[in-house]
Curated annotation (Swiss-Prot):
Family: Belongs to the mitochondrial carrier (TC 2.A.29) family.
GO biological process: transmembrane transport
PANTHER family xref list: SOLUTE CARRIER FAMILY 25 (PTHR24089)
Residues given in the record as Ca(2+) 1 binding sites: K65, D70
Gene Ontology MF annotations: calcium ion binding
Protein name: Calcium-binding mitochondrial carrier SAL1
Gene of this entry: SAL1
Function of the molecule: Calcium-dependent mitochondrial solute carrier.
InterPro entries (UniProt xref): EF-hand-dom_pair, EF_Hand_1_Ca_BS, EF_hand_dom, Mit_carrier, Mitochondrial_sb/sol_carrier, Mt_carrier_dom_sf
Amino acids binding Ca(2+) 2: D93, D95, D97, K99, E104
Amino acid sequence: MLLKNCETDKQRDIRYACLFKELDVKGNGQVTLDNLISAFEKNDHPLKGNDEAIKMLFTAMDVNKDSVVDLSDFKKYASNAESQIWNGFQRIDLDHDGKIGINEINRYLSDLDNQSICNNELNHELSNEKMNKFSRFFEWAFPKRKANIALRGQASHKKNTDNDRSKKTTDSDLYVTYDQWRDFLLLVPRKQGSRLHTAYSYFYLFNEDVDLSSEGDVTLINDFIRGFGFFIAGGISGVISRTCTAPFDRLKVFLIARTDLSSILLNSKTDLLAKNPNADINKISSPLAKAVKSLYRQGGIKAFYVGNGLNVIKVFPESSIKFGSFEVTKKIMTKLEGCRDTKDLSKFSTYIAGGLAGMAAQFSVYPIDTLKFRVQCAPLDTKLKGNNLLFQTAKDMFREGGLRLFYRGVTVGIVGIFPYAALDLGTFSALKKWYIAKQAKTLNLPQDQVTLSNLVVLPMGAFSGTVGASVVYPINLLRTRLQAQGTYAHPYVYNGFKDVLLKTLEREGYQGLFKGLVPTLAKVCPAVSISYLCYENLKKFMNLE
């Protein structure tokens, strides 16, 4: 059995110094991120060209977080890393002979191969396709392993015939020693608690992803799937979030459309009675309470979910495009700024990316949004329900103004969504980045090893959503009234944005611009929190980050 501590402290220090010298390409005793990238290129390391992996490794090496790694930093990193590597080696080296054969690695990697092999199949013979894939990984990770390949009977090999020469070394002949294992994984970042997992993930992503078709076309299959995954995760998150908060959305639309209801918090009951002399002062209640009673009287609990089916149809592409476009736009901004990773993107560019993503999402689903508001503003005593109400409303809209009516107020909507999405996505990203940096410093860990708990994500989402919704609420209210104009609940008709603004101020004053803000925030806080919570967890589940 191999002993971990077979080398003396002096020998280990000499080895660390030699390794550091290979990374110190400028020979000044300090290694920067650019130096590390150059060293990987110069030494033909398997991860050369993978700036993301090298940056993660550099972050782990930079123990004191001064953006420079010296020999002292490297020794601390290496000592901690080798302890982890040794433990991993022991788990894989089941016969404890101090060597790991390709079959032992195959058994371990089969668990990591996108969970394509179930635990109850591990004892069965692996398919030739998977064996070939793992063998390619073995050769990629340990290109110098041939010094330790057990080539038995070399003398007899020279006497082989031409046919015999075509036979390759068997899998059982391939192995790596602990020293080779350690030297490779020492310069691999650690994700999800395993350096081997990280190495195999990068190999699979950047080497196995390129699939040559019969015509020789190169298609980046997994890269496409990875990018598309952000859209899928965003869409699912939006559907879950919107369904959970549908009643609040119904109340918001009801209050925005009803201009005859005034807040009892901002107005005294005497003032309200002056506007409506026939009202009973003892029965004057808040608009929110009146909305709840009216909706419940209309159809019970189901009344609070009117339009939610349409909401789901709308929110999946909207949320999908918002989150997916945000990730794509951040990558574009990263290239424009010359950053190596989206995590290094400036706050300004992050906010801009969020705003652009919101605009793309809003424009794509605007007709569905308009139809939804029209359905929710139908007469409370209408005999049409469900799909019948939906289809009849759509027919009436098309008959009244054609497709153009479905895009009424789109300019206001696009302009209004930019600051909201920018503040929402940008603030959440900024909070997430700040928290990870703070925790990494407190726990003395690399930032890539800091994970966000669900209890942290929820308040972050609530805060970012509240900030965004509050700032742009007046624009959102005016847009909604433009969309709902001429309906039973909102019979007024406007000539444009300026007209709806002036008439709103004339009828309700400045407080009218914030009517429905309370139920909106009551909806936004949990909605955005749930959305981000689902999105962050789905990204982890789908291995998107």
